[in-house]
Every structure is written in C-alpha cells, then in structure tokens.
Amino acid sequence: MTLKEKIDSFPFWYHKIDIGGEVTPGWAPLNADNYNIPDDLTGKRVLDVGAWDGYWTFEALKRGASQVVAIDDWSDMPYAKDAMITKKDYEKRTEWDTFDFCKSHLGYTDDQCQRYTMSVYDVEKLGMFDVVFFFGALYHCRYPLLALDKLSAVCKEEIYVETAVCDDYSAYTKTIGFGYGNMGNVVMEFYPTDELGYCPTNWWSPTMQCLRTMLASAGFNEIEIWKFMEPKVVAQCRGFAKGKK
C-alpha cells in the first residue's frame, strides 16, 4: 500500500499534515502563519491541547521543541449537520490513529512526543510546560475560564489561544457583521444546544476583548489579541490571543 493509500484509508482527517511529501486531506489550519507561533522553540516543553491529528504537535517539534505532550478528550463531534463526515464514518476511527500514523512517519520518538486522552481540567498531572497551545478548543469547554486557570497553573512562559469569536457574528442572528465587537464589548455568547455550527459541543464564543480579559483573569500578562481576518463566512470568525507569565 502506498503512503497516499494509507492516508486515504482513514475515514476522517481534521489537519493538513505533510508527511513524506503527501499531505493529509484535512482542512485545518486555515492559515498557519496567522497563529504567530515562534519560529524557534528550541529546548521548550510544549503542551498541545485538543491535538487531533497533531499538526501543532509536530510543528512544535519541527521548530525545535524538546518534548511535546498532546492531549485530547475526543468530545468534539465533527459529524454535526454541516460537517464533512457522517456519524457512522466518525465512529469507525480509533482515538489517536491518525496522530500515531503521522508520528511514526515523521520519525518522532515516544520521549519527544507523548499523547494522552485527557480533559483540559486534569492537566496538572502532566507537570509544567514552557509553552501551551490551546487551539480550537476553548469554545468546546463547558467551563472555559476554569480551563484557562488550569492551563495557567502549568504554563511557565507563554500561551497561544485560537477560538471562535463573536465580534462579527452571532449564532442567533446568523448574519456576518452582526456581532458584539464594534463597541469593544466584553461579552461571551452561550450555546445551550447546537446554535453555533449545529454542533452540540460548541458551548461559547467570546469577543476579542472578552478573550483578553479572560487570559488576564487567569494570570497572564502582556496579552496580545488579533483576528484571523475580516470575515466573509462564519468559519473565518476566529480570534487569537497570546499571553505571558
């Protein structure tokens, strides 16, 4: 079986990962440069929360990280009404199957690259980290501020966050341009069922200013925030934040 055939044998890919010249058929990240991750992570111990197929885990290792610990609790359900996979196909996958496949082909050792099925609320079991990645996961947390508190407690240097934001879009108006960001509002929109993206694991989306104040409340300083872009579609309504300890 060729490498491409092996890649295609998996029922679902979330990330686009280059392994040996073949790129896995996911869709994320939409633009990796927008995350503003340091080019040099030499010697850093990194935590990747919500790792999925492992794009950011392997990217940190490429940039010199001495060890990356990836966690996911697999609570997200990409077979929501607007997703590109059925529930039947999603349930065919095995936890960490695509991650382990990529890790093997990229040649990383167990010491360099560890992964655990774990809630973000339990990260203290893993020790301290220089850098934390928290991408595409905040809005899946029922208790988002608690999640940031937990991550702050294990972060020695920097955290990078990417999340859905409601500055330019409300799931209740369903129109781009009708959000909460124009007045710098510090608000968070709550989704009790599947209002955002028809996905029942999407609980919240903050405004950019709310994201900033949440990081500050969790103990981070020198916080920077930036949008993914001026959105034209809902998938582009994303925001980033960086905080230091």
Segments (PLM) and residue ranges:
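N-terminal, positively charged/glycine-rich alpha-helical extensions of SAM-dependent methyltransferases
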Residues: 1-19
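Conserved alpha-helix/loop element of class I SAM-dependent methyltransferases that forms part
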Residues: 22-44
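Conserved class I S-adenosyl-L-methionine
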Residues: 44-52
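Conserved SAM-binding loop of SAM-dependent methyltransferases across substrates and taxa
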Residues: 53-65
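Conserved SAM-binding motif I beta-strand of class I
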Residues: 67-73
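S-adenosyl-L-methionine
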Residues: 88-124
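S-adenosyl-L-methionine-dependent methyltransferase catalytic module, highlighting the catalytic core
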Residues: 120-125, 129, 142-244
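A conserved beta-strand element that flanks and buttresses the S-adenosyl-L-methionine
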Residues: 133
